[in-house]
Amino acid sequence: MMDAAAESVMSSVRERFPLLGRQVNGRPLVYLDSAATAQKPEAVIEAEVSYYRNSNANVHRGLHTLGDEATRLYEGCRDRVAGMLGVAADQVTIQR
């Protein structure tokens, strides 16, 4: 059994993931198949929707505006992740 503080933290984390708000068989959904796919928090879903609506193009390939925008977004993401991890950007690999 979790104490009240731990339960509050878990609840606040779960609230960030829209799918985890579902009930299955009358109980809160618990998703344990993370080897197959990971659930996304609302912030990630919103960022992906914005990307697909506004900047969707191949990175490092196009010699056009959308390709340049997509490449800047991609490399900006790599730079931010590297900063959070305290490593060089070329050490960060982004997988689909």
Language-model-detected regions and their locations in the chain:
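Pyridoxal 5′-phosphate
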Residues: 1-96
